[in-house]
Amino acid sequence: MDKKAARIRRATRARRKLQELGATRLVVHRTPRHIYAQVIAPNGSETLVAASTTEKAIIEQLKNTGNKEAAAVVGKIVAERALEKGIKSVSFDRSGFQYHGRVQALADAAREAGLQF
């Protein structure tokens, strides 16, 4: 099993448990150059809020989009957008990525901005 297949297996297991709970989830995906965050409805078919380092407004604020500072900006923005829509509590779905570095920075920034998980 290669590295990507193992990550997808971990993500699938976690998502199955979150779907059983019927929780709104904050999903994070990272690539070497960008980080993406989405708040997905409990049924899993609707994206309620999204933010990523590919957005023009976010790119203008940053020197580099593949670091912890960029992840923190995305976390803050996705939390603000979720709170505007009335979403206060979510479950964190790290998509099989280790809770470390950019994923942790995004989560911490979202918590500081008022999102609960």
Swiss-Prot record:
<dbReference type="GO" id="GO:0022625">
    <property type="term" value="C:cytosolic large ribosomal subunit"/>
</dbReference>
<comment type="similarity">
    <text>Belongs to the universal ribosomal protein uL18 family.</text>
</comment>
<protein>
    <recommendedName>
        <fullName>Large ribosomal subunit protein uL18</fullName>
    </recommendedName>
</protein>
<keyword id="KW-0687">Ribonucleoprotein</keyword>
<keyword id="KW-0699">rRNA-binding</keyword>
<keyword id="KW-0694">RNA-binding</keyword>
<dbReference type="Pfam" id="PF00861">
    <property type="entry name" value="Ribosomal_L18p"/>
</dbReference>
<dbReference type="InterPro" id="IPR005484">
    <property type="entry name" value="Ribosomal_uL18_bac/euk"/>
</dbReference>
<comment type="function">
    <text>This is one of the proteins that bind and probably mediate the attachment of the 5S RNA into the large ribosomal subunit, where it forms part of the central protuberance.</text>
</comment>
<keyword id="KW-0689">Ribosomal protein</keyword>
<dbReference type="InterPro" id="IPR004389">
    <property type="entry name" value="Ribosomal_uL18_bac-type"/>
</dbReference>
<comment type="subunit">
    <text>Part of the 50S ribosomal subunit; part of the 5S rRNA/L5/L18/L25 subcomplex. Contacts the 5S and 23S rRNAs.</text>
</comment>
<dbReference type="GO" id="GO:0008097">
    <property type="term" value="F:5S rRNA binding"/>
</dbReference>
<dbReference type="GO" id="GO:0003735">
    <property type="term" value="F:structural constituent of ribosome"/>
</dbReference>
<dbReference type="GO" id="GO:0006412">
    <property type="term" value="P:translation"/>
</dbReference>
